[in-house]
């Protein structure tokens, strides 16, 4: 096995909401659509390394909970693994509003 990279950081759930406009303070806005995908700095770097065929090990804590379950399933589907498992805590999420 050749040299590789160690990728340390976060794997999070990105919840992307399509909206007509960014809401002003104190106002509401309704989403036209929603999608969910894995994001986070470490995951994004690992995904790019995988596409370029670079050996890497992803150290991104994967917890327990609904966000962690989604992330774990998507990591497996994409061929990524993380040996860091955290009991009693869920992964985070980022709510992204896109005009």
Give names to the regions the model predicted:
Residues 1-61, 66-70, 76-77:
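Glycine-rich phosphate/adenosyl-contacting loop at the front of the ribokinase-like
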């Amino acid at each position: 096995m050749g040299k590789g990279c160690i990728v340390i950081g976060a794997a999070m759930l990105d919840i992307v909401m399509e909206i007509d406009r960014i809401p002003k303070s104190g106002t509401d806005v309704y989403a036209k659509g929603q999608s969910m995908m894995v994001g986070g700095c470490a995951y994004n770097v690992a995904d790019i390394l995988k596409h370029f065929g670079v050996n890497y090990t992803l150290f991104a804590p994967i917890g327990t909970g609904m966000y962690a379950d989604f992330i774990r399933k998507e990591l497996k589907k994409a061929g990524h693994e993380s040996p860091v498992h955290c009991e009693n805590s869920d992964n985070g999420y980022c709510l992204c509003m896109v005009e």
